[in-house]
């Protein structure tokens, strides 16, 4: 057993009343009970003394006082302040460190979303992406963990969590843009027409995966897929001079019935086993709130993308 501390640099400051100053709160990260400690307001405060660089607050346990801007006081003597960083403390085994590092992005995303919901400010920017540390090795999600040992300097624990694989591939001429493709990209960017909704939703879904928000990714991608399927079926009705699209659509609500509608019309579906690869992933997520893992979500999104690309060749609105 050992004692560990971590410094969590917040993506966005948390605004607090004076009663929160110096307080500690418990949470569970990867099955480990972690204490999150807030910095303290000084007993006396002169707004002209402390700089914005060093901050106004006193570090928990008086660690990293000079190296970290823990937060700023906004109103005195009311003691309204904002926090930039928190100190994390727990007792445990060194083997638990990597599991905490691995689970922290999920925990942080959930925490940030709870703050967003509680504040009602849904326009807040997204959390910062991970970075690779230039000094000290490892990756950085906003949390750095150190081991406390008596009469020894702090020992930094490297974040060696596994990242989602980055595909490295040799570039062939077929993958490179020719002059007509580049010209079309610039023309489309300057067009008054917007990108169609299925592609915009698909982009949002992929971004949700990056944030480990797998449920949102699956549900958003399903909405994109429904839009694309309906657009393809409507085009079939127009091409065959059929006038009952709106009536028939009311009989084929929900994604599963829309796939059956494609089969009824003889429209090819690019993903042959769509029941297993798409519906069996989307339905329990949407209806029962089940959470998928990275691999199943990534495979699901790729299958959704295949269908959307086949059914929506025109990227811009008509």
What is the predicted role of each segment?
Residues 1-130:
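Long, contiguous, compositionally biased segments that the model treats as domain-scale units
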